[in-house]
C-alpha cells in the first residue's frame, strides 16, 4: 500500500512539474535599469524581476531571449517567444501589430548632454543626438524635430559611450534610464524638457503579446493586478528606482 501511495505521489509530482506553463519573454538587454547583462552574464533589471514575479503569480516558468530592440515585435509575430517585456511604450502604431497588457510603468523621455550646454529642444538644432534604432525616441525626433540630427545605435549603451567620448552632442532616452547615467556622470545634465507625448510614448510601458494569444494577455493582466495589490510590485520598483 505504501508503495502504491508513494508511486501515486511521484506521478502527481511529475505531472505537476511537466504541466507548468513556460513563458519565454523577448528582451533587449541594453537598457538598464530595465534590462541589461549583469556580472554573471545573466539578464537582470526591473523588467526581469517583474516578469519573474508575474510568472510566480501564474505558477509558470520564465525564460528570456535577448534580441535587438527593433527585432522584438517581428520576432514575437514569428513566435520566437511568447511575450515581450523590454521597456516598450504602448503606442497606437505598435498596438496595430500586438496586444499590450495594462501599463506597468509610467514613462517620459528627456535628452541629456554636457551639463549646462542646452535647455530646450530649440537649442538642439543641427546637433547630433543619439538614440536606439527602432524606438519611439527615434520616431519622435524624426517627426517632431527634423532639425535635430539623429544618430541611431544598436544599443543605448553604445550611444552613451559616444556621448562621454564627445562623438555626439546628446542622448535621448527614457527619464528613468538617463537618470541612472547621471548618477555616475556628474559632467552630464538634463538638456531639454521632459516629453510625454501620448502619440509616441503612449500611456506607459506594457508587455506585448500576439493578438491571438488572449489567454496569456488575460493571465498577465490578472497577475499584474495581483502583485500590485500584495505589494510585490512596489518592492521591485523600490529596488530599481529608489527615491
Swiss-Prot record:
Superkingdom, taxonomy of origin: Bacteria
Keyword tags: Amino-acid transport, Periplasm, Signal, Transport
Listed GO CC annotations: ATP-binding cassette (ABC) transporter complex, substrate-binding subunit-containing; membrane; outer membrane-bounded periplasmic space; periplasmic space
Signal peptide: 1-19
GO molecular function per UniProt: amino acid binding; arginine binding; ligand-gated monoatomic ion channel activity
UniProt cross-references to InterPro entries, sorted A to Z: ABC_transporter_arg-binding (IPR053530), Iontro_rcpt_C (IPR001320), Lys_Arg_Orn-bd (IPR005768), SBP_3_CS (IPR018313), Solute-binding_3/MltF_N (IPR001638)
A Gene Ontology BP annotation from the UniProt entry: L-arginine transmembrane transport
NCBIfam families: 3A0103s03R, ArtJ_Ecoli, PRK15007.1
Subunit description: The complex is composed of two ATP-binding proteins (ArtP), two transmembrane proteins (ArtM and ArtQ) and two solute-binding proteins (ArtJ and ArtI).
Protein name per UniProt: ABC transporter arginine-binding protein 1
Species name: Escherichia coli (strain K12)
Lineage summary: Bacteria, Pseudomonadati, Pseudomonadota, Gammaproteobacteria, Enterobacterales
